Amino acid sequence: MNSAVTSPFASTTVTTTSTSSSNSTTRSNTNSLVIHGLPPVSPSFQLPFKLTDVDLLRRDCHVHGEWVSSRSNKRFAVLDPGTGRVWATCPDSTRDDVHSVIKSSFSAFQVFSRTTPARERARLLISWHHLIIASRMDLATILVHETGKPLNEALAEVDYGAGLVRWFAGEAEHLDPDPPLPSPAPSPTTSRASSPTSEDSAASALPTPGTGAFLRKRGAILKRPIGVVLALVPWSFPLALTLRKSAAALAAGCTVIVKPSSETPISALALACLADRAGFPAGVLNVLTTSLGNTPVVSEALCMHPLVKAVSFTGSARVGKRVAASCTRNLKRLSLDLGGNCPFIVFDDADLEQTAKDLAALKWRHAGQACVAPNRCYVDRRVYESFSNLLIAEAAKLKLGHGMTRGTTLGPLTTIRGLYKAEALCKDAMDKGAVKLLGTGRREPGDGYFMAPTVLSGMTDGMLMCREEIFAPILGLYVFDTEDEVVSRANDTPVGLAGYVFTKNHDRLWRMFERLEAAVLGMLGDGYTNPSWKQWQWIHASAIHGPRRISDNKGSRDATIVNDM
């Protein structure tokens, strides 16, 4: 999953400058939008949509229950990927803004963790869930204009995220039971057949069962909220991942700082607005926005601050390594969900027609910009041609367009950077012998960051598309002959988040389940995550811990309790 925590690409930034000249707008060579004059704290652009709840549209940072700008008063632009036009701006926070946000979260934690029992936290989460559902269409509309995804996909993301909040609300009620008091452990044996050694003498000095000293001691474990949790959220599924990270931490009694991607800050701010209405105390959920250019500095400052006790990051493996390096300096608790270059394996006995439909749905969801989207489609040579034809027929049904246009099933890429990378990957494959079966592999003419669904055949393992996370509506088809061969090739990747297998042979399914090195496996279907999963495992550089993160936000304390008898 790509993320904007660090990037070599320039961002689009709105800079406020004081001048007596007219309020003209200029664009520099670095793609920086400069607004001359002193605009209001939240500069207003003509919105391309209308919300039922206009108060839900927030454009400032959310700190301790207040809507504030950055200290520099600079702002960055939020673009609609479907048009390439600016429709909002947000504060471009810097390192100077970090301490005040963390101070707010820490002071709120001191009260929230001690005075809000589990049942009250569950009630707050349920209230938040109801408000999210009530604002379902407004939130989805914001998502469409942030990410570019079609409206039906945005609505599905809202529903999924709301379901996570409701699930964690249920889990919250089970978090504060009285700690169990274990039975006294047997003492070391004091009798020895031979003469006592120095170790025997030390053991004989320990209390034995039945003595007063032994009966007065009990072991206990007290689980407490770990503290301030930082959520670094990508632009691919900004609402769902903000809710997944935040709801788990809030259920545990922690406070949360959300640092959304520079492409998708408005949805996180809308969720903070609803959290206020739900009754969460000030400072429990803070949102700090910043531009792409300032993201590395701000993220590092947040990760390295001593009052931040846990960090949850979703994004690329490259950036995840940098986040991990920043966190390990202070030994913070860390949760990483990283990239995937997912294989999709079609054996000759699979239901080819249904498999082609499933592949099209999985691959072109959000224009291929999902960490679990299939990138490498391995097809048994005996059914390669027939399956290719079925897949092309399914892909040809997709309707490319703006996410708010009725009937759209494939939206634009979220960023121009992603579009340029997709073009480069496609060109590399074709230069090395790949053949286009569908699409152009290039940007569509007109406004927005559109690319038609593209299918390439004749793919080889030496092409960049086989090695890198694509995050675009491009799919490569690879031929294989044996099960051992396809397992070896599928596992030959540094990022193995997900994988898919389609066959009617149940023995083969179990073998693939055991042999494929992927954290999430879809057998004859999708491998979507759900909140009840306890943990993902280490799979290459893809996943460390999973959606069920409540235990990640709790700390354990060991104690020896002496009863005053």
Predicted regions and their residues:
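ALDH superfamily catalytic-core signature
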Residues: 318-460
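Low-complexity, intrinsically disordered regulatory regions enriched for serine/threonine
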Residues: 2-32, 183-208
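Hydrophobic face of amphipathic alpha-helices that form TPR/SEL1-like repeat modules
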Residues: 2, 7-8, 29-83
